[in-house]
Structure formats: structure tokens, C-alpha cells
From Swiss-Prot:
Any GO CC annotation of this UniProt entry: cytosol
Organism annotation: Dictyostelium discoideum (Social amoeba)
TM region(s), chain numbering: none
Pfam families listed in its UniProt record: cNMP_binding (PF00027), Lactamase_B (PF00753)
Name the record gives this protein: cAMP/cGMP-dependent 3',5'-cAMP/cGMP phosphodiesterase B
Known cofactor(s): Mn(2+); Mg(2+); Zn(2+)
Location(s), subcellular: Cytoplasm, Cytosol
Sites where the protein binds a divalent metal cation: H573, H575, D577
Length: 1096
């Protein structure tokens, strides 16, 4: 037998020795004392998983990061490792090493660790798996297989004496029996069987080895005894807070920093050595604003991150096609399935809907008015029918092994090409440079090894290369391989966020009629702080947003404007610079209302379905579509809207509205050219009526919002300057850069709330508008949701509207709670702890009501952190509604900006409802102590995926419609098959979701997790329909749950939030089961391929 391979096996046991010794020396987890190494040699059972969990936990906690595992978390992490990693290990005979490696890395990454630690862990883990794979294949081919296995499991006296301090003879007897059993199982290849033992130990051992140099500086300070904690003056709660702060401070994305650069949002750029061509992973909407030179893009694991598309390739394509005149094509690297989805998106954007998806015949109600959108497209672009998608873009798809090979030009020698292999393993993207060159080098090295098998130095070269058995991957050390985890769903941060060029608005009141421009530029404008065209039309204090730009939601929320203030959307067409921001609005909080034609809505639905991967029915639950027609006017927020199709390359609607004898119009993207219209009329392409409406539809208004751009897709500025002067001065030109020359005759509006243009209406309409605004606030307020219409009317007449100046006190803690408030505009800060500023400087402010002036005083220069921030639509002073009690305020409330409030005095409400006071109190009652105790759990439950910011009023509504239910340790909450009549949020404790029928654990839930989502279906089905539970839920610890009955929450908006969360939970569970190892289809075990040059 070749002694070199015997030495390699001894080295393996030495590594194992080193690993166990390090645990013995450094580990401080009390639970690990019960670890029994011998139990890992037996078949899978309860003891095996328990010890495996402790084993992995010890490695992770001791060597990856520091200060992030608490003693209380040991059991939880152990259970999770049993559930995920343990079950994956059960399927090792059907898994490749690389798949196992990804599973391990995912578990480590979820727990935490620094970037350098995780990258190093990946490198050494792959190194070991590849190396041991070759060793196992060598064993399998050997004629002396039995002898080699016996040598592997030899007693301790046959090995180096240094291992004697780790194992005793009984340990090696067990190991010997284990390997003997391997050889008796039909002489099966040890490839899969040995990997059970090796991967249990060695994959994470390499993580330990990679961090050995820094181990002395990474000592754990967890699991100190109570005596030690007392001595250090640190309580367990303080320690948890410190650990949480550490995690937040040190949380980093997972990528190779030496070769990969993080750029805007969750996207990254890789530049190969000796190459000027970069490759970007992730394509957020503002990619071109950062860099116009990149034309190679890798689509990440998820096409969207949070609420933003990471596959926004439309404008890189348009830039290369129209600005660069087709010098280069965009290269998209993705999976086959992603290619199909992206093709759908691009076809809708570039070519528009197919003929069978155009419904103008049923959308137009005007007699003798015909619009042939396909013919008009050809009139604008005569080559439209000849171009195919491949004239814009090149797709390169990963093969069945997750591999793409590309050649890039060398920077030092343009005549040569650089070989690059890109590998996608379940979202882990790795770049392997000079793959083909190295493959040849490896072949030569293996031949050299075959000539001199006795030369041990050949196995320890510093420039070591490895190839796996299927020949799909080369791993080179010395930073030749770079990796990026594309499964990270980090928060999108635009390159140029809204508000970057102006301060946060200190005072904003939505006007009766006006326009706020969120963006006035286009997708190919790369100048500072340019945003794509979109705007809000304010009507009676509420907003209709037109083509919302990306980032608008964050900007509005920063200034205290949330979904219910702007929950109506008009979509003009399906180009990325007009529809990208709608996704943010759809999932912001409320179920928004979308106004557009059937043709455009179905086109957008096809794009959205391809982007999200969700079925159409699920997407329809996130917004309500209101079809608009050409010829029939519709009412939105009291204004009368009229729509028509513009003259554009894909179906696009324009509109005008009228209210209070004032008109606003919008052209949308269009080509306005009188000479072209005349030419097309002479050719019989456009009818006389069509031309008349194209010439006059938008110009009959008090404010004309008109686009401008490059012909023939857009309207040249010169054409607008030819309009009569009385029209030009009413135009607000958009969709153009700041460099456009308007000759001083046409206004290019400014962006931002502070630049809102107000259209003055007759004084007689102001009272009507104010009544509508108050009534809207009452309708949205969940506190009054149980009142009858007559009672709401009585409440309406009792309110007063007041203004509070910035920094003034609205409510002082400890003062009588005798007023209830609804915020109409502005933001306030709530301080539950005593509000005591450091300095004693005082300022005096005033609160002006319709009839009174109230003087207030507040100390300035405070540094106290507010408990909560509140904005428009939210409520204050709820304790004042307990009309049968006199209660003091529990918090101080300060105006962060100028604030407009609706106010009800307790005394007025008592007087108005004195005859049925108890009935009124029961309808508006809110259990404030219960609500406060529930707040954290509810915010955790609803802040992910469904809504980024669930506000106080919504939290209060959900909490007020819930009740606490308690369960003891191991008590069943509900069983599979039980009637599903309620949903739950975990307020305290933990819950195990499992299937008694299938005898498996589905997942573990913690504080803030939401479950029991099948109950929401009751509100959508026949009253006789009773859904049943699909799993069993059991309390692991003493647990308190918030029980939600959908019938107890009558506000439709709050019901929608809960139902969206329930549907998202159901979709997540489907995905979870789809990737669960329990139901994964087993694959055929891998064939063992011989490695040339290795023999015994």
C-alpha cells in the first residue's frame, strides 16, 4: 500500500485530535459536557441528533464570531440544527458534497459570523470535501480495500502516540466496528458512508482550523455563572442587549471583499484579474446612475429583494440599444427558469402586449372612435415587427451543474481572452478565473504525481489545485475563487434617495387640490438627484399617485405620509421607469387601488407574475384593479377623471381630471407632432377623430403636465415651444433632464413635498373639502369602526381642528387625559419615560384652535429617545375615551414637525352620549395595558414581507381585537384536522409546528411569529365552510399567544393587513416544504469516477 495515502489518513485523525483537544480546552458551554463522541458512530437516533447538535453548536459558538450565543439559546439552536442540518445529513447517500457544503454554510451564515470568517470557512470546507472525495474513491478502487479500511480503524498503538490523549481503546473499538460494518454492506462504496462520519466532523473542523490564528482574541464571554455575572455587574438582560448591539454592528453581507465590491443596494460587482469588463450580480433600478459601462449581469437567486426588482434590465438594454447605438448587447447570466421570466418582462416592456391581449374594442365607448395600437406602434417605429429579443440581449444560462463559461478580453493583451467559469450553487455565486488553463495544468501535475508517487512534497504544494469527480469545478487558492451569496435579501438603498437635495419637510398639509412632483426626469438621465417621472395629485387632502418612482414610498414615509393617505395609483404604461415603484406601493401596507385599462393591467400582471414568481390570484390580493375606459368618466376622491390612449410605442393612457371648476391634465409618454399627425392622416393610419383628440385632449386644463424627450417615442421640446403662449405658461414639462432648454417659457417643476404646487379653488369649496377630509379620517380610524353611521355623524360634529407647532408639547405625562386626537398631518414623538431634557432652556409655543389659543412650554435640547413615532392617520390620548374614569396620561407627546390634529374633548363626548354612555364606551373601548403588552410581538409579526412599517394605529387595532391565551409546557395548542377558527401570534414562549400524520417536525416558532393562517379563509368562503388545520402546534415552553379572530376586527383595512400576512405565511410554508429535505425527491447516488494519477 502506498505509504503516502496512509499518511493522509493518519493526518485526518490528527486533525480530528486537534479539533477535540481545542474543544476540551476552549469550550465554555456547560451543555457540551454531556457530549459522547461514540454516539455519532451509531445509527441515527435521538442521542445521535442531540450530540451532533451539541457538536456543531460548540464549533460554531467557539470559532465563528463572538458574543452572539446566549446560554438560553443553546436548546433552540440545537433543535434547529436537528431539524435542518440533521435531516439533511440523513440524505447524504443522495447528496453531492457541494450540496452538503451549501447546507452547512447556510446554517453557519444564519447564525452569524464576520465576512472573513465565513469566506475562509467556505474555502477550507470545499478543500476538505474535494480532497476526501478523492481519498474515498481511491479506497473504493483499491484491491486492498479491506486492508486499508482496517488500517483506518486500527487501535491506538498502531498510530502516532500523540492521539493517545484524545481517544481510548474503547473509542477505537467502536470506530473499527463501524468501518467493518461499512465493508459488509454489499461491498458498497464508502463514498457516501464515510461522508456521514467525515461531514459530521471535518467540514466544520476546517472552519476551526481557518480561525486558529485568531482564536486567542475570540474567547467567548457567554454562559457565565450567575456569580460571575454579579461580579462583573452585568445582568443577563444587559448581556443580551450587548450581544444584539454587537450583531447589528457587525452584520455584514457575505462576499469576497478582495475581488467583489458591494454597490447600490443588494448588488455586487466582480472584476476579473487583467480585465476591464466587470460583472454585476443583481440589477436594481438605478444601475445606470452608478455605472453605464457594465453590460454583463448575473440575476441573483431572488428577482426581487424586499420590494424592489433586482432584475431591472430594461434600461441597460435601452441604453446600449439607443444611446450606444447597439455597439454592445447586454449579457444576462441566469437560470433557464429565470430566463423565461425575464423574457416575459422584456417582451411586455419592449414590444408591448400580443395582439390577443389588446382590448381597445371593449375599452372605447366613444362612437366612431377607433384606436389601432399595433398600427400606431408601426407608424412610430416601422422596424418594430422585425426586431426580436435577441437583437437587444444575450442570455447565458447555467447548465444542469449550475455552470456558465464565458470568455472576456484581456486588459494587457486585447488579442487574448480570459477564461471565466461562473458557478451558481443554490444562490451561491462563485467566480473561477482561468478555468481552462488551470484544467490543463492540473492534468500535467497529475501526470507528474503518477511518475513520482513516493514524493510526498507533491501533495503539499503551496499552489494546490483540486478538481471534483464530475470535472465541474476548479478551486484555486490565493484568491483565484471569489464568492457572493445572492440569496441575501438586504434592504434596497437607492444611489440617489429622495430628499437627498433638501431637508426633511418640517410642515406639510395636503392641499385641497395640488400636485407634488416626486420625479420629473427619465430612466436614462444620470445627473445628480434625478428621479423618473411620477407625481401625486392631492384631492381633498388625499393623494392619487401617478407612475410612482422607485424610492417614493420611503421618502413619503420619512415625511409622515403612509399608505392610507396615498392609496390610489394610476398606471399609465408598463415601461420600467413608470411601473417599478408600484411594487413598493402594493406591498407597503394597505391594499391599494390601481386605475388603468384592461390592456395595461393584464400586461402589468404578466410582468409582476414573472418578477415575483407568485400566481396571478395571489397577486390580485395585494391590489384592487378598477378598469378605466375611453369615454366614460370615473370618480376618484371626488374628482372626475377622463382617460384616453396616448400616441406611444406600447399601450399608454393619458388623463385629465376636474373638481371645484379646476382641471389638471397629464399627457403621459407620447409623441406630439402635428406634421406627423397630418402625414399619418394622409396615409389613412389615423382617423380625423383620433387626430383631433391627440391635438386637444390634454391642453384644455389649468395645469398641463406634459412629457418631453427624443422623437419619435417622445415629444421634442421644440414642438411644445410652438404651442400658443397661453398654453405654454400652464405646462409643467416632465420626463426630461435638467439640461433641456425650455427657453424660459415652460416650467420644469421642482421635486419634493416642500415644492408642492397648490391650485387655488373658490372659497365656497374649502368647507366641503375640509368636511371630506375629517370624514375620511373618521372612516380610517379603527377606534370608531364599531359605531353606527348615526353615531359617527354625532362624533363628527364634536371635533375641532388645531395646529401645533414643532417642538410643542401636545400631551404631558401625568396630566389629566381629557382629549382624544387623530393626526391629520405631520409627525409626533411619544416618550413613555419621563421627558427630561438635559438643558433647562425653555421655549413657548402656541396651539391655535378655531376658537381658542393654548400656550404650551417645552424644554429644548432633549436627547431622550422616543418610544414611538406617530404620523398622519394615527391616534393619541386613547385613555380619554374611557369616559367613566379619570385617567392621567401615561406618556409625553411632542410635535416633531408642525402638526394638524383633530381633537375631541372627554367632556363633550360624555355630554353627547350620556343617555347610552356604557354602550358608547364599550364600542370605543381599548384595553391599553393589553395593547402595550402586545405591541412588540405584533410589530415583529407584521413588519416582515407584508409591511415595512406597521403603524401604531394598526398595531392597536390588531391588539384590541386579540386576547391572551396561555399554554403549559408541551401542551397542544391545536391538532391536525381541528377546525381552523383563529390565528395566533406568539407573545411569550416557543411553539413547535409538526405533523403527527407524517411524523416530522415542520419548524420551530418564537416570539413574534404568526401561525394558524388557514383561519382567514373563513372570511372569503361560504359561511358553512370550515377549514381544518393542516398541522399540529405544541407549546415547547410555558407560552402566551395572542389569539386573533377575524370576525372581531371589523375595519376592512386592518382585516386586509391580517389576511395579507396569512397568505404570505401560507406561501412561505409551501416554499419551505418544497425545499424541505423530508420531501425532496431522492437522487441516484453519484457514480465514482477514477482520478488519473492516483493509485495504491
Amino acid at each position: 500500500m502506498n505509504s503516502k495515502y496512509g499518511d493522509n489518513i493518519i493526518d485526518f485523525l490528527r486533525y480530528l485530535e486537534k479539533f477535540v483537544k481545542s474543544l476540551t480546552k476552549d469550550n465554555k458551554i456547560e451543555e457540551f459536557k454531556t457530549f459522547d463522541i461514540k454516539s455519532l458512530l451509531y445509527p441515527r437516533n435521538k442521542d445521535y441528533f442531540g450530540n451532533l447538535s451539541k457538536f456543531l453548536l460548540a464549533v460554531i459558538s467557539a470559532r465563528i464570531g463572538s458574543n452572539f450565543i446566549n446560554e438560553d439559546d443553546i436548546f433552540e439552536i440545537s433543535e434547529l440544527l436537528k431539524e435542518f442540518l440533521g435531516q439533511e445529513l440523513e440524505h447524504l447517500p443522495y447528496l453531492s458534497y457541494e450540496e452538503l457544503y451549501v447546507e452547512i454554510v447556510e446554517q453557519v451564515g444564519e447564525i452569524n459570523g464576520t465576512v472573513s470568517e465565513i469566506i475562509e470557512a467556505i474555502t477550507v470546507t470545499i478543500d476538505f470535501l474535494d480532497t476526501f472525495e478523492k481519498v474515498s474513491q481511491t479506497i473504493d478502487r483499491s484491491n486492498e480495500k479491506q486492508k486499508l479500511l482496517a488500517y483506518l480503524s486500527a487501535p491506538v498503538n498502531q498510530l502516532d502516540n500523540s492521539v493517545s490523549g484524545v481517544f481510548n481503546e474503547n473509542d477505537y473499538t467502536d470506530i473499527q466496528r463501524f468501518f467493518t460494518e461499512l465493508t459488509n454492506e454489499n461491498n458498497q462504496s464508502p463514498d457516501s458512508n464515510i461522508s456521514i462520519l467525515i461531514n459530521d466532523f471535518q467540514s466544520l473542523l476546517n472552519i476551526l482550523e481557518s480561525q486558529q490564528a485568531s482564536s486567542s482574541s475570540s474567547k467567548m464571554i457567554i454562559n457565565d455563572s450567575p456569580r460571575t455575572q454579579q461580579r462583573n455587574g452585568t445582568t443577563e438582560q444587559q448581556k443580551k442587549q450587548q450581544q444584539q448591539q454587537y450583531l447589528q454592528k457587525n452584520k455584514e453581507p457575505f462576499y469576497s471583499k478582495d475581488k467583489i465590491m458591494q454597490v447600490s443596494g443588494p448588488s455586487y460587482v466582480f472584476t476579473p484579474s487583467d480585465c476591464n469588463v466587470s460583472i454585476q450580480v443583481g440589477i436594481p433600478p438605478d444601475t445606470l446612475k452608478r455605472d453605464q459601462s457594465i453590460c454583463h449581469f448575473i440575476v441573483p437567486h431572488f428577482l426581487i429583494s424586499k420590494d424592489v426588482s433586482l432584475s431591472e434590465v430594461e434600461f441597460p438594454i435601452f441604453y446600449n440599444k439607443f444611446v450606444q447605438k447597439g455597439k454592445t448587447k447586454v449579457v444576462i447570466i441566469c437560470t433557464v427558469e429565470q430566463k423565461q421570466r425575464i423574457e416575459t418582462i422584456l417582451c411586455e416592456s419592449i414590444f408591448g402586449p400580443a395582439p390577443e391581449h389588446i382590448y381597445t374594442d371593449e375599452e372605447i365607448t366613444i362612437p366612431d372612435y377607433k384606436i389601432d395600437l399595433l398600427t400606431e406602434r408601426l407608424a412610430i417605429d416601422p422596424r418594430a415587427n422585425d426586431e426580436k429579443l435577441d437583437s437587444y440581449v444575450i442570455f447565458k444560462t447555467f447548465d444542469t451543474f449550475g455552470v456558465v463559461d464565458i470568455d472576456l478580453p484581456s486588459a494587457s493583451d486585447p488579442t487574448k481572452l480570459i477564461n471565466l467559469r461562473i458557478r451558481n450553487t443554490k444562490g451561491l455565486i462563485s467566480f473561477h478565473e482561468d478555468y481552462h488553463v488551470v484544467q490543463k495544468q492540473l492534468h500535467l501535475k497529475l501526470q507528474e504525481q503518477q511518475q513520482d508517487q513516493q514524493d510526498k512534497s507533491s501533495s503539499s504544494t503551496t499552489d494546490k489545485q483540486m478538481i471534483n469527480t464530475s470535472g465541474n469545478r476548479i478551486i484555486l487558492k490565493n484568491n483565484t475563487v471569489s464568492v457572493i451569496d445572492s440569496t441575501i435579501e438586504s434592504q434596497y438603498v437607492p444611489v440617489l434617495p429622495f430628499g437627498n437635495d433638501h431637508e426633511q419637510v418640517k410642515k406639510f398639509k395636503a392641499p385641497i387640490l395640488g400636485v407634488t412632483f416626486l420625479g420629473v426626469s427619465h430612466g436614462l438621465d444620470f445627473t445628480h438627484c434625478s428621479h423618473t417621472t411620477g407625481f401625486i395629485i392631492w384631492i381633498n387632502g388625499s393623494g392619487v399617485v401617478v407612475d410612482p418612482p422607485v424610492g417614493n414610498t420611503t421618502y413619503l414615509q420619512t415625511n409622515g405620509i403612509y399608505g392610507k393617505t396615498v392609496e390610489h395609483i394610476i398606471l399609465t404604461h408598463c415601461h420600467a421607469d413608470h411601473d417599478s415603484g408600484i411594487l413598493q406601493k402594493i406591498i407597503e401596507r394597505n391594499k391599494v387601488t390601481l386605475y388603468t385599462t384592461k390592456t395595461i393591467n393584464e400586461s402589468y400582471m404578466r410582468k409582476l407574475k414573472a418578477l415575483t414568481g407568485l400566481p396571478e390570484q395571489s397577486l390580485k390580493n395585494y391590489y384592487t384593479w378598477v378598469p378605466v375606459t375611453i369615454g366614460n368618466k370615473i370618480k376618484i376622491l371626488g374628482a372626475e377623471f377622463e382617460f384616453d390612449y396616448s400616441f406611444h410605442v406600447i399601450p399608454t393612457i393619458r388623463f385629465k381630471l376636474e373638481i371645484y371648476n379646476k382641471k389638471i391634465s397629464y399627457s403621459a409618454d407620447t409623441f406630439y407632432d402635428l406634421q406627423k399627425f397630418k402625414q399619418l392622416k394622409d396615409q389613412g393610419v389615423l382617423s380625423k377623430k383620433r387626430i383631433e383628440r391627440l391635438k386637444s385632449f390634454v391642453f384644455d386644463a389649468d395645469m398641463i403636465i406634459h412629457e418631453s424627450g427624443v422623437a419619435p417615442i417622445h415629444t421634442p421640446m421644440a414642438n411644445l415651444l410652438e404651442l400658443p403662449s397661453e398654453i405654454r405658461k400652464k405646462i409643467r414639462v416632465v420626463h426630461c433632464s435638467s439640461s433641456v432648454d425650455t427657453k424660459g417659457e415652460i416650467i420644469r417643476p421642482k421635486e419634493g413635498l416642500e415644492n408642492t404646487e397648490i391650485i387655488k379653488v373658490d372659497r365656497k369649496y374649502k368647507g366641503v373639502a375640509e368636511c371630506i377630509q375629517i370624514q375620511t379620517a373618521l372612516n380610517h380610524c379603527s377606534v370608531f369602526s364599531k359605531l353606527s353611521p348615526a353615531e359617527v355623524q354625532r362624533v363628527f360634529f364634536l371635533c375641532k381642528k388645531i395646529w401645533v407647532k414643532r417642538n410643542d408639547v401636545i400631551i404631558k405625562k401625568g396630566s389629566p387625559s381629557d382629549m382624544f386626537y387623530i393626526i391629520l398631518s405631520g409627525k409626533v414623538l411619544v416618550y413613555e419615560n419621563e421627558y427630561e431634557p438635559i438643558k433647562s432652556t425653555t421655549s413657548v409655543g402656541t396651539v391655535v384652535t378655531d376658537t381658542t389659543t393654548i400656550t404650551t412650554t417645552v424644554k429644548t435640547d432633549a436627547i431622550k429617545i422616543p418610544t414611538i413615532k406617530l404620523c398622519a392617520g394615527e391616534t393619541l390620548g386613547e385613555s380619554a375615551l374611557q369616559l367613566d374614569k379619570n385617567i392621567d396620561a401615561s406618556a409625553t407627546v411632542i410635535a416633531e414637525t408642525d402638526v394638524c390634529l383633530l381633537v375631541w374633548k372627554t367632556m363633550d363626548l360624555r355630554t353627547e352620549f350620556h343617555s347610552n354612555l356604557n354602550t358608547f364606551i364599550s364600542k370605543v373601548h381599548m384595553d391599553l395595558s393589553h395593547i402595550n403588552s402586545c405591541r412588540d410581538a405584533i410589530i415583529r409579526a407584521f413588519q416582515h414581507n407584508i409591511t415595512q412599517h406597521i403603524n401604531k394605529e394598526e398595531v392597536d387595532s390588531i391588539a384590541n381585537g386579540s386576547k391572551d391565551v396561555s399554554f403549559a409546557h408541551h401542551q397542544v395548542i391545536f391538532n391536525e384536522g381541528d377546525t381552523s377558527d383563529s390565528m395566533y401570534i406568539i407573545k411569550q414562549g416557543r411553539v413547535r409546528i409538526h405533523s403527527k400524520k407524517n411524523k416530522n417536525i415542520i419548524r420551530y416558532l418564537n416570539v413574534g411569529d404568526f401561525f394558524g393562517e388557514t383561519a382567514y379563509r373563513r372570511s372569503n368562503e361560504d359561511s358553512n365552510f370550515l377549514p381544518t388545520r393542516s398541522f399540529t402546534a405544541t407549546a415547547i415552553d410555558p407560552t402566551i399567544l395572542l389569539k386573533l379572530d377575524i370576525e372581531s376586527i371589523v375595519n376592512p383595512r386592518i382585516q386586509n393587513i391580517i389576511e395579507q400576512k396569512a397568505k404570505k405565511n401560507a406561501e412561505d410554508n409551501i416554499r419551505y416544504h418544497a425545499y424541505s429535505p423530508k420531501i425532496r425527491t431522492p437522487r441516484t447516488p453519484r457514480k465514482v469516477y477514477p482520478i488519473e494519477g492516483l493509485s495504491i
